Amino acid sequence: MIVGVGEAMVEFAPAGAGLYGRAFAGDALNTLWYLARLGAPARFLTRVGADALSDGFVAFLSESGIDAGAVSRDPESTMGLYLIELDGAERRFLYWRDSSAARRLADDPERLDSGLAGATLVHVTGITLAIIGVEGRRNLVEALGRARARGARVSFDPNLRSRLWPDEAVAREAQAAIYAVTDIALPSFDDEATLWGDATPQATAARLAALGVDEIVVKNGAGAALVHGGGEVRAREVEARDTTGAGDSFNAGYLAARLRGHTGLDACGLAHRLAGEVVRWPGALAPAATVEAMA
């Protein structure tokens, strides 16, 4: 069982003629959704409201083949939302998430342990770390340590969103703590250059390897992904319509292939192909049938 831990948000993406389509998304959720489409058993650990919108999200998980048993409900909050504005294939996000119930997804250590029970892989992101606060981060890191002791592996995508952190020092401290319980690191080079001052993807990989992370893939946008100790894998050129969800789908393609026993280099090949397909569609989630055909 793969467990994704993070925030689910309501997404409004341009649908043409000045209209917006509604969907559910979030970086860890996107990765988990793509993993489920690729045939992996998946569970989402999050916290949402007790309103009709949150009911719709839980139904969405079930319809997507994702176990919703680790979704807790908060009667005093609801889901955050964001709106995508496009400039060509690039996008700008407007967020409304201050009252998001997911900010309290890690408040209860027992609930974390229950949600992570039976996991073979747990996927976490830097956005999750940013929104759950100091106590939540401590609870989550400790819960991940217990999950690893039970045999789970942990994958982490730093996915830096500077505006969610009080300052860079807090973000670096939080990342350092979670890397102590991380087996697979999936950073993006531009984030690492911003937060850590890394000059090259190789410098990022070397820094994380020195922290004891076993498996490292450094993404570099449309450029080559670096597999630490293995080499680089280049992406094929595609005409991008919307790059939302590209990194999340890359993570899913890579993890799905590794779980099937493929090498890191081969797994990057699938990851690039999946991400290249995803950017051809609007919003974070490509059509399910398109993704399932790649399984």
Over which residues does each language-model region extend?
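Glycine-rich phosphate/adenosyl-contacting loop at the front of the ribokinase-like
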Residues: 1-66, 239-240
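Active-site metal-binding loops of divalent metal-dependent hydrolases
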Residues: 8, 158, 249
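Conserved N-terminal subdomain of the carbohydrate kinase-like
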Residues: 12, 41-127, 295
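Helix C-cap/helix->beta junction micro-motif
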Residues: 38-40, 147-151, 181
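Hydrophobic anchor at the start of a short beta-strand
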Residues: 41-42, 68, 154, 216, ...
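Conserved phosphate-binding/catalytic region of the ribokinase-like
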Residues: 145-146, 197, 201-295
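Conserved phosphate/ATP/ADP-binding segment of small-molecule kinases
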Residues: 150, 160-230
